[in-house]
């Protein structure tokens, strides 16, 4: 591609495709944008290694005093106008107003929105101000407010949209206008990284040329003299993102009957969860005209009040998945030689969709009664009602041959001995499953019953499951991603919180950087579905995976469970055990064997290494999981050794081992990635290791 560079006053430059008129762009609706930055330390551009050495031992505020971020490129792309880039934010957004952009997508708003934050909230804070609605309770915008903004985000730092109201003068009639432009994050729909996205979607431009991620040395860019390769890199990123969005939008429209869109005038989707929720409700209420009517119909069928929602959350009815490690094997290198067999890693085929498929809907208002009355009429109620116990006291002791799988919601840990003296709502079916793991005793304050309805999720689940299988057979990547998105993102929206912490971004006067300030908690029931139904789905999934662990591990000839001997690890839908299982791997809800491992080492939940292949004592293939640390960093360390042995892995993949990684930080100018050292697992995490007699801290098979 050939570019033209035009220098403006105040050291501003613009880069655009040759032949395009950037001052009079054609009208477009959708575009893609990105930013490129340089990181300065003490006013100089240095390598990551230099920055790491200089900042070692500094506090975060000391780091912020020495670091600065400079956005040297604000770039965007649309088909009508091609590539545009500038080093000036006002020039950039004015171009968007002239081009009539309504929706501009970035990839990973954590960084791109942070650069906008700094421009608006620090550098130009006298000009920009918070946008005000027409009145306090109105959702309508006041379109005549130039240089205003509105950010949609949550208290955990997730960024969803940034809306800007930008003044501009029509280049033809010279009339003044204010244009509203909405910036969104495509990563909230399809995560995984832009490089992977371009490859997997097989993204092509309008002429059929493939677009793939290019390489650039970020800290060695000479802004005053950009090379052709550097310009190509900048253009390629936004061009690739644009055509990826356009390609995926075609699938979205096809699969939703044109009700949902991420491209063009009809754009109405911001996140994967929002898309999945819209489609789930459409499958349940096909006769209703729109999403709003479907939500109202759902709320009529599932009348959960604000007080009931808060009650069930406060009493822990809604909980997440199980993730725990058999403490007997924590921190030890387990080998095929010791167990005389490989360790198998099984995954449930679409666990949460299977749970949705398996449960009956819970409808109407709840019934409440005493435990005594329920037990006297259990046969009558159990058939037609889902039963919840509100317990005020639960105790339990682990049964012989089992491991701790009961999560104490106050202690926030899995316990072998249960001693709960607080109110805890739990489904009766889940208590029945835990009776097989623990010797339980509990007192019930009251019994809550919900009427069972139809299997309302089956159509949605099975249609998308079949689409996923079809996409796999026919290599339809966009359809595969769409169906997976539907299956994996829908259940969580059923129990979406109605209470949300709010806050705003502002300049921190102490550091000169932008930071987040919490305001208050807002409650909105307008789009609330049912925390009870969402809780039943997660409860069913927990019960199912626990029952599968028992089934896989089996019992000895005396009936004693072998879970404590064979089981290693569970994470949500994944079971790791020295045990065999035969089932239909392609069936919804069945287990499929993802790997057979020669050796494994699990040092913490979500931090482990599975060694798949060993030849003549040399490790040939392995899979790493490392919470809070990119697996590529650990892999790079292991790849330094031409002959990677189990002994070497045992030493490197261990407590107290540090790795150099990149961490996001708000600094003056925006947000940057700075090099820091992080533990794979902190040394104190090894303090509770279960040491068998004779264990020497290295290999179980070398005792």
Can you describe what each PLM-predicted range is?
Residues 2-9, 15, 23-26, 41, ...:
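Conserved acidic
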Residues 26, 32-39:
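Catalytic phosphate/metal-binding cores of nucleic-acid and nucleotide-processing enzymes, i.e., regions
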Residues 44-58:
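Short, polar loop/linker segments at the starts of domains and inter-domain junctions
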């Amino acid at each position: 591609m050939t570019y033209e560079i035009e220098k403006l006053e105040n050291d501003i430059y613009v880069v655009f495709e040759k032949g395009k008129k950037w001052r009079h762009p054609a009208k477009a609706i959708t575009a893609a944008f990105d930013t490129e930055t340089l990181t300065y330390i003490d006013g100089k551009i240095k390598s990551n290694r230099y920055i790491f050495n200089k900042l070692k031992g500094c506090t975060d505020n000391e780091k912020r005093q020495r670091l600065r971020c400079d956005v040297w490129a604000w770039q965007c792309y649309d088909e009508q106008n091609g590539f545009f880039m500038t080093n000036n934010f006002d020039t950039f957004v004015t171009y968007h107003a002239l081009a009539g952009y309504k929706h501009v997508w970035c990839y990973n708003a954590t960084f791109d929105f942070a650069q906008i934050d700094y421009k608006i909230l620090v550098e130009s804070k006298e000009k920009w101000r918070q946008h005000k609605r027409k009145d306090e309770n109105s959702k309508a915008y006041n379109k005549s407010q130039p240089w205003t903004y509105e950010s949609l985000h949550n208290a955990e730092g997730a960024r969803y949209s940034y809306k800007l109201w930008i003044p501009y003068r029509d280049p033809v009639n010279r009339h003044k206008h204010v244009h509203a432009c909405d910036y969104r994050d495509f990563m909230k729909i399809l995560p995984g990284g832009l490089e992977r996205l371009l490859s997997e979607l097989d993204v092509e431009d309008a002429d059929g040329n493939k677009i793939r991620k290019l390489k650039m040395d970020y800290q060695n860019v000479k802004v005053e003299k950009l090379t052709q390769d550097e310009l190509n890199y900048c253009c390629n990123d936004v061009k690739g993102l644009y055509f990826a969005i356009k390609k995926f939008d075609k699938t979205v429209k096809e699969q939703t009957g044109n009700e949902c869109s991420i491209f063009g005038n009809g754009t109405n989707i911001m996140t994967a969860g929002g898309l999945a929720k819209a489609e789930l409700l459409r499958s349940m209420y096909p006769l209703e005209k729109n999403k709003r009517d479907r939500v109202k119909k759902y709320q009529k069928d599932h009348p959960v009040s604000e007080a009931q929602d808060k009650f069930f959350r406060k009493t822990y009815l809604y909980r997440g998945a199980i993730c725990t490690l058999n403490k007997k094997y924590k921190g030890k290198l387990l080998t095929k030689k010791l167990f005389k067999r490989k360790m198998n890693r099984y995954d449930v085929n679409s666990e949460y969709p299977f749970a949705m498929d398996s449960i009956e809907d819970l409808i109407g208002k709840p019934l409440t009664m005493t435990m005594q009355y329920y037990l006297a009429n259990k046969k009558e109620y159990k058939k037609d009602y889902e039963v919840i116990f509100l317990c005020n006291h639960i105790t339990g002791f682990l049964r012989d041959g089992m491991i701790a799988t009961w999560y104490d919601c106050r202690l926030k840990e899995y316990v072998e001995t249960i001693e709960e003296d607080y109110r805890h709502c739990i489904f009766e079916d889940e208590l029945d499953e835990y009776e097989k793991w623990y010797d339980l005793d509990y007192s019930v304050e009251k019994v809550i019953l919900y009427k069972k309805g139809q299997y309302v999720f089956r159509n949605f689940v099975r249609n998308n499951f079949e689409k996923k299988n079809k996409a796999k057979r026919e290599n339809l990547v966009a359809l595969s991603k769409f169906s997976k998105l539907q299956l994996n993102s829908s259940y969580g929206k059923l129990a979406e919180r109605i209470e949300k912490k709010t806050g705003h971004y502002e300049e921190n006067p102490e550091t000169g950087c932008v930071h987040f300030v919490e305001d208050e908690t807002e409650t909105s029931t307008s789009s609330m579905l049912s925390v009870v139904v969402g809780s039943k789905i997660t409860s069913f999934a927990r019960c199912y995976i626990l029952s599968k662990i028992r089934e896989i591990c089996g019992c000895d000839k005396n009936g004693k469970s072998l879970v404590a001997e064979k089981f290693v690890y569970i994470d949500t839908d994944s079971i790791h055990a020295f045990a065999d299982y035969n089932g239909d791997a392609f069936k919804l809800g069945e287990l499929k064997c993802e790997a057979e491992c020669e050796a494994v080492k699990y040092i913490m939940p979500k931090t482990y290494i599975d060694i798949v292949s060993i030849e003549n004592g040399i490790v040939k293939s392995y899979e790493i999981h490392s919470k809070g640390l990119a697996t590529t960093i650990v892999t790079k360390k292991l790849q330094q050794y031409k002959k990677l042995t189990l002994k070497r892995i045992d030493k490197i993949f261990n407590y107290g081992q540090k790795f150099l990684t990149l961490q996001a930080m708000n600094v003056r100018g925006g947000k940057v990635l700075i090099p820091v050292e992080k533990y794979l697992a902190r040394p104190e995490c090894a303090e509770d290791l279960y040491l068998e007699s004779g264990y020497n801290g290295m290999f179980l098979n070398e005792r």
